[in-house]
Structures are given as structure tokens and as C-alpha cells.
Amino acid sequence: MAHACVSTSASSLRFTAGFVSASPNGSSFDSPKLSLPFEPLRSRKTNKLVSDRKNWKNSTPKAVYSGNLWTPEIPSPQGVWSIRDDLQVPSSPYFPAYAQGQGPPPMVQERFQSIISQLFQYRIIRCGGAVDDDMANIIVAQLLYLDAVDPTKDIVMYVNSPGGSVTAGMAIFDTMRHIRPDVSTVCVGLAASMGAFLLSAGTKGKRYSLPNSRIMIHQPLGGAQGGQTDIDIQANEMLHHKANLNGYLAYHTGQSLEKINQDTDRDFFMSAKEAKEYGLIDGVIMNPLKALQPLAAA
């Protein structure tokens, strides 16, 4: 007779599917036999890991945001076959990287652009990321628009850039000098190379930095290829940009041209306090809330 629990009878026992039955022969013992309606949990987990190990590379990557990088999130099996292959993919807000499946979802892009638009209504623009033609075109358009809307109110430009194209940076610089409103510049994070040049190009008395920012100046970088004449042309062009940038830096900082030439011969890093002493900026903002409004002259 079958029972739903283990019997303590002296008769021999036979293991069936979750039931215990008495053996028809009480004098001998049958070998235990286990019959389950499904595989044990350990076997199912092992089979699942083997299946995941075969299929995880074929799964569609999902992009997740990490700092300034968009990292495709590839499902990876856990356990003895755990493999993680992280690929750092740089992205730029000026290019719809989501179209290639490696950028933020459209909703994230819309929210980001919405925040930028809200700041723009308060005459706050950003110079963030590498300085290239696309960034320059956007900033130039923003400066011209704000000049047309109200030429009497200051414009605040936040700089967090490692530098970039000299010609693109000069387009922004010339527009800053061309428009009527004062342009207050604020360094947030890093202003290096062309980023530092644009930071120093703000209206004198209205150039600021947050306390933990870093600022770096150096000479233009580039390369050339082709015949000797081609290389000479490119070398002369680099010398022109170097002399032009150093001349403006000397004017913006009050340093002598000889000192600027010497300091920019190699990467010259400064803290916010050192940049103020050097003349690149006019003050260090210890209270970040003050930077949310157009800044008065020091």
C-alpha cells in the first residue's frame, strides 16, 4: 500500500515518485530506485548555463550610460563560464549614436536636449567635449541668437573640454568678440588646450572656475604628410596658429609673449587658484550657486 510519507515499518522500502511503498517480499530488500517528475535543480541550472554559454554572444547588446561613455551591456552567464567583454564606446550628444544601436535611447536624448534648452532660456550655454566643427556651429548659432534677443544681458558659457580643432575654436572665439553681450566663462572639470583658450577669452572680470577644475595650455599639435613642399606648407600653418594663439594668450593673461612661448612648449597644468594668479581667469567660485546667474565683474 502506498503512503505519502516515509513509513517506519520493518518491511523493506521502495522509492517511487515521491511515494514510499512496501515491498511485496518482506524478507529481502530491493535496491533503492529514485524516480522524479523533473530534473534535479542542480541539473537544470547546469543545463541553463551551458545553453547561456552558447547563446550569450548572439544576444542583442543594450547600451547603458557610464559617465561620458556609452557601454553596450551584453548579457553574460554567471557561474564557471562567467565571461564579461566590456567595450567602451565614446558618444557625443551632437551625433545620434542611437541610430547605430550604440547610444542612448531616444527618451534619454530628448530629456538631455530638454535640459540644454531650459538652460539656454536662461542664457546659459555649454562648451562640453571635444571642440569640433559641429560643436562650433551650435555654439556660434546660440551666441548669435542670444545677441539678437537681448544684447544687454550677459551670456554664461560653461567650459568642460579637453580641446580640439584650432579653426573650430577660433570660430567660437571670433563670435564671442563679435557679439554685443559680455560672455562670462566658467570652467567646470577640465579646460585644456583650446578649451583653456576659450575660457580665457571671456570678458575680462567675468572669467571664473570652480575650485577643483584643472586648466592646461600648450602649443598646437598636428602632423603632415606628402612631399617636402606639402610638409613645409603644413609646418608654416602650424607656426601661424602657434603665434596667433600665444599672442592672444599673452593679451588675455597679461603675461609676456616670451613667458607664454616658454610655458606652452609643453603641457602646462594649473589649478583654479594657479590659473587665477596666471591671469587665465579672474576668480574662483567657492559657492557654485553663484554661477547659476550672470556673473558681475569682479
From Swiss-Prot:
It is an enzyme of class 3 (hydrolase). Mostly expressed in leaves. Also detected in stems, and to a lower extent, in roots (at protein level). The gene is CLPP5. Residues 1-100 form a transit peptide. The keyword Magnesium does not apply. Transmembrane segments: none annotated. GO terms for cellular component: chloroplast; chloroplast envelope; chloroplast stroma; chloroplast thylakoid; chloroplastic endopeptidase Clp complex; extracellular region; plastid stroma; thylakoid. Disruption phenotype: Embryo lethal. The modification N-acetylglycine is found at residue 101. This is ATP-dependent Clp protease proteolytic subunit 5, chloroplastic. HAMAP family: ClpP (MF_00444). Belongs to the peptidase S14 family. Pfam families: CLP_protease. GO terms for molecular function: ATP-dependent peptidase activity; serine-type endopeptidase activity. It is found in: Plastid, Chloroplast stroma. Cleaves peptides in various proteins in a process that requires ATP hydrolysis. Has a chymotrypsin-like activity. Plays a major role in the degradation of misfolded proteins. NCBIfam families: PRK00277.1, PRK12553.1. It catalyses: Hydrolysis of proteins to small peptides in the presence of ATP and magnesium. alpha-casein is the usual test substrate. In the absence of ATP, only oligopeptides shorter than five residues are hydrolyzed (such as succinyl-Leu-Tyr-|-NHMec, and Leu-Tyr-Leu-|-Tyr-Trp, in which cleavage of the -Tyr-|-Leu- and -Tyr-|-Trp bonds also occurs). The active site is at residues 193, 218. Its EC number is 3.4.21.92. Ubiquitinated in vitro by CHIP. InterPro entries: ClpP, ClpP/crotonase-like_dom_sf, ClpP/TepA, ClpP_His_AS, ClpP_Ser_AS. It comes from Arabidopsis thaliana. Keywords: Acetylation, Chloroplast, Hydrolase, Plastid, Protease, Serine protease, Transit peptide, Ubl conjugation.
